[in-house]
Amino acid sequence: MKTVIYPGTFDPITNGHLDIIERTAVLFPQVIVAVAASPTKKPLFDLQDRVQLAEESVAHLPNVRVIGFSGLLADAVKEHDITAIIRGMRTTMDFEYELQLAHLNRVLSQGVESLFLPSTEQWSYVSSTIVREIYLHNGNVDQFVPPPVLNALNRRRKADA
């Protein structure tokens, strides 16, 4: 069975990510959402929380599962017998970076290809970074994130108050 992987930090997972996951789940029989530890990015949510939020956000998709990983994506690709790496692209600004990653991952994973899926217009401007910025400045992010993330952000805001 063909299994693809959609990696990211997902800090937090957004409706843009969810759109890519839902569209990928229609195209492939098995999708793994791989949440990267990314300790150098100083995430808002720890890895365990990001995995849980991703799981809750994709619970309606029976052919999607979520894993957390640290280290190289190529190692997760080998471990899970991945057919292709899915990458979402919002704008041409993403292209150069994603192309470099695709070449690097092809070398490190012995030939596994990266497939680029363009964002829909509705979500082309949404990123986790923008969501965090809006949240940290007490803005409203409910139109940009799935309900589990919104609930977690609201709980976090109340705890910080």
Curated annotation (Swiss-Prot):
It is an enzyme of class 2 (transferase). It catalyses: (R)-4'-phosphopantetheine + ATP + H(+) = 3'-dephospho-CoA + diphosphate. Its cofactor is Mg(2+). Pathway: Cofactor biosynthesis; coenzyme A biosynthesis; CoA from (R)-pantothenate: step 4/5. Its EC number is 2.7.7.3. It holds the Pfam family CTP_transf_like. GO terms for biological process: coenzyme A biosynthetic process. Its main location: cytoplasm. Substrate binds at T9, K41, L73, R87. HAMAP family: PPAT_bact. Homohexamer. NCBIfam families: coaD_prev_kdtB, cyt_tran_rel. Belongs to the bacterial CoaD family. This is Phosphopantetheine adenylyltransferase. The gene is coaD.
